[in-house]
Amino acid sequence: MANLKSLAKDTAIYGLSSIVGRFLNYLLVPLYTARLAASSGGYGVITEVYSYTALLLVLLTFGMETTFFRFVNKEGGRDPMRVYSTTLIAVGGVGVAFVALVLGFLPQIAAALDYADHPEYVGTMAVCVAIDAFQCIPFAYLRYRRRPIKFAALKLLFIGLNIGLNLVYFLLLPALYARPAWHDVVACVYDPSVGVGYAFFINLACTALVTFFFRRELTGFRYVFDRRLMARMWHYAWPILILGIAGILNQTADKMIFPRIVEGPEGKVQLGIYGACVKIAMIMAMITQAFRYAYEPFVFGKDREGDNRDTYARAMKYFVIFTLLAFLIVVGYLDVIKHIIAPGYWDGLRVVPIVMAAEILMGIYFNLSFWYKLIDRTIWGAWFSGAGCVVLVAVNVAFIPTYGYMACAWAGVAGYATAMLLSYFVGRRYYPIRYPLRSIGVYVLLAAAFFAVMQWLPAAWPLWARLGVNTVLIGLFAAHAVHYDFPLRAWPVVGRYFRKRS
């Protein structure tokens, strides 16, 4: 239990940067959807470009984040800084080569991506993602050194700067530009024709600035590139790279494929609607990411202490409970939450429960995936994620022409379910863990039943009545969890009032 409390503490701190940070980032969703009309397709451009940058981030880190944790725990007792410096040099060198390649062939690459009129979008995000990839290693080092406070502070610094500058360039400066008294002054730093491009330029500026705060993590030691160590690390990392590519394609392939099937301005419009509504569903991604930040170093660290399979099983159960609770909360209050995006985008709200379900499956798959990392058989992850990716792409290609972006949402469910089931059944043979499936199944059925009731409530009911019923259902789910798995007597502070007196 002490191990799980340590995990919960780190998850809470990392979650501050992930959950609170992404929540603050939601300020950009109403901002973009308000300033970029759905019919303009501007938010579709943002959605598509960021889907490519997500894939590039995986390619440029090429599995070295997880590999760093494995090797710094496995061999770092002798010389952890050798592992760290080798990783930094490798990722940094690949990033520099990538930027040089993109800038050297910028017109051709921009034309291939249908951005021939705006090659600056491509060039800006290429530099941005290279810096971001390099920063992943110092961030990983902070996690290794158990310094979640600085980790969270830097993540929140980036988000705060990003939000602030976006508010300036998409809200304040356009308003001042329209006033004759301010027009000439504002014109020195603002050009309305740049439009959506400011989102990318601001991202680059904020990313570059954060790098300067890694001075202590990037100085004070001798940089050494150990070729033999790098060869062993690459042998461990390349299956993780394939796993990462397949995994990120599971998250972004729909946004890359959609404008290729639904061509022209209409494709960008529909992609923008889908992308805006997916942002609402990303609360599940926040929880999964916060859990991952704490769970990865936790698992590799505990592996050195012996067999902790019971701990992993309980962690899985708690993850499922909290993600299902988050699912019910978002769906139950969707009529309120939807106001973070402009009404012109509300047609896509029906994808929210589906995308959230897909994110839960992805989180379960992530939890299941540690068995092959712990036994150094990461190639299995590549096969599982690859199979899921094939299913996702096939569903998208087959059904987007008929069902539009609804096919994108269901494709995510199909892809993650495939990878999850493969990992579970193969893992039972190589690294069996006795997960409390019966208890987990009860929570899943309970959440499914409550979700069905929420969906079947008459639309003619007043908002307060629907929200009232949904609140009761959410409370019943939480009460079940408290009664069976989180008894009040075990809670800090309040627990003493519920313990039996002898």
Q: What are these regions, as identified by a protein language model?
A:
Residues 73-90, 273-385:
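Specific pore-lining/lateral-gate transmembrane helices of multi-pass inner-membrane transport
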Residues 1-7, 177-198, 208-251, 294, ...:
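Interhelical loop/hinge segments that connect adjacent transmembrane helices in multipass membrane
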Residues 10-25, 199-214, 218, 227-300, ...:
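Transmembrane helical elements of multi-pass membrane transporters/channels
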Residues 3-66, 95-103, 128, 163, ...:
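Signature of the first transmembrane helix
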Residues 455-502:
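Membrane-proximal transmembrane or re-entrant/amphipathic helices at the cytosolic face
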Residues 9-21, 49, 58-107, 116, ...:
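Membrane-water interface segments that mark the loop-to-transmembrane alpha-helix transition
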Residues 123, 152-218, 386-391, 405-426, ...:
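Hydrophobic alpha-helical transmembrane segments
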Residues 29-54, 119-120, 192-198, 232-236, ...:
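Interfacial/gating helices of multi-pass transporter permease domains
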